[in-house]
Each structure stands twice: as C-alpha cells, then as structure tokens.
C-alpha cells in the first residue's frame, strides 16, 4: 500500500483541490506486453472554462488505446482531468494538451481521444484526435 502525499504545512494527507493541483498522469507496467488489446476509458464529467467568457464548458471524454509497455492508472488520470476545471482554455487547445500528455506519459501503440462538448448557445462541438498506428 502506498503512502498518501502529505501537505508540507500540516502533515495531513492532500485531499480535494490540493491533490488535484498536484496531479499528473501515472502509468504502470502493462501486465501483458505481448498481447495487442484495447482499453476504453470514459470520463463523463470533464470541465474547463471558456477563455473568452469564463463560463464553464462541459464535455464527455472517451479514450481508447492499445497499450505498449505501460497502461494508465485510473485515479491519477481522473485527478489530472479534474485539474482543468478552473483553467480558461479553448476546446481545441485542451484536447490537444491532454493528448500530448497521454502520449508522452504512456507511449501507447495507438490512441484515440474523443471530446464531446455539451451545447452552449445552440452549438455543440466534438473533437477526435488520433496518435500512433493501430495494430491488429
């Protein structure tokens, strides 16, 4: 069992906003490196802020990937995704940043990130980004 990160000032475990602020994507070894398989992760409560109005934007993120040597640890991924909650950033920029971080940390054979943003002002938006070569 791993030890929880401690707040330097209080020596209490980091919780809530403080642990989200320090979040990063963590990976662990792929338990079956010889097998080609896909993992699908759904993150239905993504939020960030519009860089122009400051209003919140909501999206459902879907990640499908074929792991190479590493797989993503889900709690760290959740906290990393939650870290965008108060950041003013465009849809295009945030989805590309998330994809860059996923590729840099996990180096999957292939990955697809879909972001389906909720309608605002009668306009909805969906972004799809791919990286790598899908293996059969």
UniProtKB/Swiss-Prot annotation:
One of its GO terms (molecular function) is preQ1 synthase activity. Its EC number is 1.7.1.13. It catalyses: 7-aminomethyl-7-carbaguanine + 2 NADP(+) = 7-cyano-7-deazaguanine + 2 NADPH + 3 H(+). It comes from the Bacteria. Substrate binds at residues 72-74, 91-92. GO terms for biological process: queuosine biosynthetic process; tRNA modification. It is an enzyme of class 1 (oxidoreductase). Keywords: Cytoplasm, NADP, Oxidoreductase, Queuosine biosynthesis. It is found in: Cytoplasm. Its main location: cytoplasm. Pathway: tRNA modification; tRNA-queuosine biosynthesis. The keyword Cytoplasm applies. The active site is at 50 (thioimide intermediate), 57 (proton donor). Pfam families: QueF (PF14489). GO terms for cellular component: cytoplasm. PANTHER family: NADPH-DEPENDENT 7-CYANO-7-DEAZAGUANINE REDUCTASE. Belongs to the GTP cyclohydrolase I family. QueF type 1 subfamily. Catalyzes the NADPH-dependent reduction of 7-cyano-7-deazaguanine (preQ0) to 7-aminomethyl-7-deazaguanine (preQ1). This is NADPH-dependent 7-cyano-7-deazaguanine reductase. The lineage of its organism: Bacteria, Bacillati, Cyanobacteriota, Cyanophyceae, Synechococcales. The gene is queF.
